[in-house]
């Protein structure tokens, strides 16, 4: 009996100790013992923070002989980061300081970096990156091109540069769809199918720049499709813009919830709590891996929507007044180096790969996609530069309305979600009476001519004015949803069926 207990205790000790014994010794120094320090604000997840913090610390030690402590600041998504930077720089300007204690901004969509480059108040908050002069061979058509598929990967002033690529798409639960007798979604429009009502997982675009970009791409696809089939470009833009918003309304009406955490979507879809959702590629592929069956298949699948998604960049920038500018510039150099680029997609445990978990991100440097390098990739079959999905983002169509779009999705579909869901249920039960549908999908308040440059009041620096405008629009849409529901129920009572 004593021998058996000893064996069990020994096994338990081994299980607890094994991860510690196998773990690679941390290269990151403690705050007190480090020779250098680096403060990075980021929306990146813990896996990316850990892997890039450790890898840079080793690289910096080899280059300089100095240890470094990486101080990660993670207030939330890009919306929260913007608030931190706005308040920090406002306070810095009041006391006459150049910066606000942050060295680097790492990750998030390019919209936030463009905003920090030229904020509405004060001077530019980003400084020129030395990597452009130090490594010109990393840029150009064979490296990091300035534009691709309509997306911008660095700006003319060289104050920000894309570090890796991402693509927004659709994740879905194959088993759940089979039980419902539905085909797998292949386009944004498929998610507007009423059969998804209560089963669609969405994220709040006001909290995440990448989620907001997905909604922008959805609208722009409708606009580009309308332009192909119309003789009048102006009329086509109006029509496509309206159709885009009506599709967003369908998606919002189908939504089970709107989460602040984009990573929650593939997790819930994989578990069957939702059937499908809008999801960025690396989250979808990572969770799909976790749910793989012995035969290599997974119930969670991810697909890029046909003709409706571009290759967006996640940039990096050094902040004005960075307290540790030399180390900050070196971090950018590391991220764009061969070692930093390989880390995004190399298999865990390989010399070029992460220690703990595959990051499933795609490098931005085109020259990294050699046959030899791709043999080490987790996604070795993917080369984003060879599969664009026949979609080219056109910033002139919706770029200036980006901030307005992210606010409007919240106003139209999130703040009034209960009224919207109730109306959508009544419309489905009444078999979609045309008059009620017309009221429900009325987007005349979102006219393209008045919105294409961005709604001035929604984007106002005066918080009270912006809130009042949002309240006015919100009241309008709640009223029309309630009216559409009443019309649908009246049609049912009268026995009117289209």
Predicted features by range, described:
Residues 6-21:
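Hydrophobic membrane-insertion alpha-helices, especially the h-region
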Residues 35-38, 66-68, 100-104, 123, ...:
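Loop/turn elements at helix/coil->beta-strand transitions in domains of secreted/extracellular proteins
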Residues 80-85, 188, 265-266, 274, ...:
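Short, hydrophobic alpha-helical packing/hinge segments within bilobed ligand-binding/sensory domains
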Residues 257-323, 338-373:
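Extracytoplasmic/periplasmic substrate-binding proteins
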Residues 355-405:
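Amphipathic alpha-helical blocks and their helix-capping loop/short-beta junctions
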Residues 384-498:
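Conserved C-terminal helix/tail region of periplasmic/extracytoplasmic solute-binding proteins
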